[in-house]
A protein has these predicted regions:
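A general, composition-driven signal for non-globular sequence regions
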Residues: 7, 25-27, 60, 254-257
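Active-site-adjacent loops and short helices of periplasmic peptidoglycan-processing enzymes
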Residues: 26-176, 186
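Hydrophobic alpha-helical context, especially transmembrane and signal-peptide helices
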Residues: 11-13, 34, 38, 98, ...
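Secondary-structure junction/capping motif
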Residues: 10-14, 111, 138, 256, ...
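Hydrophobic alpha-helical transmembrane segments of integral membrane proteins
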Residues: 13-15, 63, 220
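Bacterial N-terminal signal peptides that target proteins for export
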Residues: 3-18
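Bacterial N-terminal signal peptides
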Residues: 16-28
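Domain-terminus/edge residues, biased toward the C-terminal soluble/receptor-binding domains
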Residues: 155-159, 163, 167-172, 176-343
Length: 343
């Protein structure tokens, strides 16, 4: 049995922070890579765009792919094809996936509910395949379902070939598409909001903490998923709520997990304090109106994992594990920021 938990420790002063762009750039976290980043902030209820920068450039999704895996899985539950209690089995193919993973042996049986928790908290690549095979019978058939769902949602820049986001040239998305997906999850499946906000899971005596540091460091953060491979840089799709207003932020291609979290938090904080006005974008419309750019996705492998990087990140390792001391860098951003009280 896997138990999901809320915060693992009381809120500290680090969790009440305001971000400034200057602070992020001077916190010793390293400059943004030459290819830039993709940034997008929308209102979850309306889809209104509050900020967009490179939001329609194609990008490698890495583990934010798992949000689409969750969407297809929850759709199958809604359709009655499976239930959250349905048993699914770890196949040899699932067990052979690269880290990050749970590492279960072939033949291990888990429920759909527990598999979703492990995939979303641990970012377990093996469990994403377990879900795919359990829902559709094979990874290829599940990828077909992912692509059909993308087409139905209007995610015109996305193509999926696997359920976990491990490196694949043909697996692409954009900040626009990921914001559309995040909004669909929140609007279509409000009863499953708890999946995006699990701070940690307990497996036996083992405590596994969520890779999304915003959940315990930014007040009001309540989802959703991080991602990293060398080609993509550090990605996050995040949500946060203050009062009755919920926002979705997408950051693709950040130079570290610390920068990724800080930029998402900065967008949240700026928007929450803007009295509902668009931030520097008075006529940006909704996320569905953003025009896709026809281009190849940037490949950040050299910038993220090349020899010139002081601490090259590992290709197969996911999230904060890939950067070792990035969490210390993130702490320096928070500790240097001004405090504020909830609105």
């Amino acid at each position: 049995m896997i138990n999901g938990t809320g915060p693992m420790h009381p809120a500290s002063p680090l969790t009440t922070a305001v971000f400034s762009l200057g602070l992020v750039l001077t916190a010793g976290l390293g400059p943004a890579h030459a290819a830039g980043e993709a940034l997008l902030l929308i209102e979850a209820d309306s889809g209104k765009v509050l900020k967009a920068e490179n939001a329609t450039y194609p990008w490698y999704p890495a583990s934010v792919t798992k949000l689409m895996t969750a969407y297809v899985t929850l759709s199958a539950v809604k359709e009655g094809r499976i239930t959250l209690d349905s048993p699914i089995t770890v196949s040899p193919n699932a067990a052979a996936q690269q880290p990050t993973k749970m590492g279960f042996k072939t033949g291990t049986v888990v429920t759909v509910d527990n598999a979703l928790k492990m995939m979303l908290v641990r970012s377990a690549n093996d469990i994403a395949v377990v879900l795919a095979e359990g829902v559709a019978g094979s990874v290829d058939r599940f990828a077909d379902e992912m692509n059909r769902a993308s087409a139905r949602l209007g995610m015109t820049q996305s193509n999926w070939v696997n359920p976990n986001g491990l490196p694949a040239d043909d697996q692409v998305t954009s900040a626009r598409d990921m914001a559309i997906l995040a909004r669909a999850l929140l609007v279509e499946f409000p009863e499953y909001n708890g999946y995006w906000n699990i701070h940690a899971i307990k497996l036996g005596k083992r405590i596994i903490r969520n890779t999304n540091s915003l959940l315990v460091r930014y007040p009001g953060a309540d989802g959703m998923k991080t991602g990293y491979i060398c080609a993509s840089g550090f990605n996050v799709v995040a949500s946060a709520t203050r009062g009755n207003r919920r926002l979705v932020a997408v950051v693709l291609g950040a130079s570290s997990s610390a920068v990724r979290a800080a930029k998402a938090a900065y967008m949240f904080e700026t928007a929450f304090n803007s009295n509902g006005l668009n931030w520097l974008m008075p006529s940006s419309g909704t996320v569905y109106g953003l025009q896709p750019i026809n281009a190849a996705p940037p490949n950040l492998h050299e910038a993220m994992c090349g020899k010139q990087r002081r601490r090259p990140a590992a290709e197969a390792a996911d999230e904060d594990e890939a950067t070792g001391s990035d969490e210390q860098g993130l702490a320096s951003v928070f500790s240097g920021a001004k405090g504020y009280g909830p609105k």
